[in-house]
Amino acid sequence: MTRIRRRKEANDQASPPRVWKVGKYIRLSRDDGNSESESIGNQRKILDQQIPGYFHGDYEIVREYIDDGRTGTSDDTRPEFLQLVEDVKKGKINCIITKNLSRAFRNSANQGKFLEEFIPLYNTRFISLYEPCIDTFLNPEVVHSLEVSITGFMNEQYAYKTSVDVRRTLDTK
């Protein structure tokens, strides 16, 4: 019995606790003309207040990725999101945190591919603080939930409806 205990103690010492390397993702689709949008500041404040409650060990805020004035309907038009993806691939980031799914995605297909394929492939933690709350480390199955899928479709429809309304307004001027 002693050998088992020693082996377990040796294994515990050999693998140090995981340090979460956090990337905060913040996005606003419309620029309000200021150097930094008010909503960007609000998202940052919310993330900074909530982050400590999600980690029961070491974590380090590596970087903020901010796409101000960028739509969430396409990944390839958001330079900071693309940089975040590259940093995950390079191992610089192993945890992404955002206010809610609509900040990261306004396209349900991209959302599904990212959460169901990319996140597990790179052994990365994804946290969405609100609507719906997601933590792929504590509850990996949540990405397959009906609530996450419906939220993705609702976010996509919101972007589409807003686009139609804006075009209609511009056409009447």
Please give the residue ranges for each predicted region.
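Short, structured surface patches at the beginning of a domain
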Residues: 1-172
